[in-house]
């Protein structure tokens, strides 16, 4: 959701941004600008009528006080009132159309975002860690997990259908160890406050963070109760402060949560059909920050380093890329992806996205802070995975396997077993 003043004053620049993002309905900006202008004209008209009604109402009072006949002037007041209601109805209709269009617009891109059409145009920023070499052909994580009896995909499919799995024995312990390890690092070393949040949220929450209305078909919804299974803890964590005004001295606020995440993966038919990479339910530790606009770039960098620190402690090789204009999410202004090396799959795989939304989500969710001069301003929101646990699990199996099928648990996790 964009600032209306920005839309009217930067129409051509906004169209260019939409084109870079691959947004096809660029002409909608001209329509939006026309609606904004009509709203302003209607508002001026209704303000003048209210002013007229106030003057006439005072005159009615004066005539009544002097004992005069108010029949004619009262009829005039009634007509003005009816005209005001008529224009207010038009105003409401225009406002609803404006909001619906604005909710479908993507965020403004940061100048640092490279131009591009797809994931192939993303730009590598740097690589960390040495890619391991093996004296044998490394196996993919799903083969390793099944051989160790740590992962049972067959029973997952039996329970829930495709893209499901179950963990067993030390395999289940590894999942729990990763969750506790990540939360401990983020709370004890990085200064985040741990929060437990629901796995079901209302439509207002999904709208504030940008999942609704545009991407409604991508998520699981419980129609009877008008609730939605969360695709990420970003949704409940960000909405903790929806419709609230935060005192300036409380910023920045940094929160983290471990949750299950649920995604339909409707557009991924045929992609990563085996293993833990693309499933309908997975575990993730999420990071969310609320900060002042002038601090958001620095806080974004900090969050990226926090997500990277988990991989450094686990000694997993990875790289950081910046997403191009055609691959970045509609809600984000700038996003860095962290991709971990997967020897068994012989490729890098996304394990975290760290995004700065600027005031995009805050405007949708009315998340503000009161500055020292008493003014209410929109915060900036930042979020990232810290990390996706299933993919981290898969990376450990592939990077720390040996020739006889054993997996060596990273040193930092051993105390959690």
Curated annotation (Swiss-Prot):
Keywords: Aminoacyl-tRNA synthetase, ATP-binding, Cytoplasm, Ligase, Nucleotide-binding, Protein biosynthesis
Coiled coil location: none
Catalytic activity field: tRNA(Ser) + L-serine + ATP = L-seryl-tRNA(Ser) + AMP + diphosphate + H(+); tRNA(Sec) + L-serine + ATP = L-seryl-tRNA(Sec) + AMP + diphosphate + H(+)
Residues holding ATP: 263-265, 279, 350-353
UniProt-listed Enzyme Commission number(s): 6.1.1.11
PANTHER family, alphabetized: SERINE--TRNA LIGASE, SERYL-TRNA SYNTHETASE
Family per record: Belongs to the class-II aminoacyl-tRNA synthetase family. Type-1 seryl-tRNA synthetase subfamily.
This protein's domain notes: Consists of two distinct domains, a catalytic core and a N-terminal extension that is involved in tRNA binding.
Subunit comment: Homodimer. The tRNA molecule binds across the dimer.
Protein name: Serine--tRNA ligase
Species assigned in the record: Leptospira borgpetersenii serovar Hardjo-bovis (strain JB197)
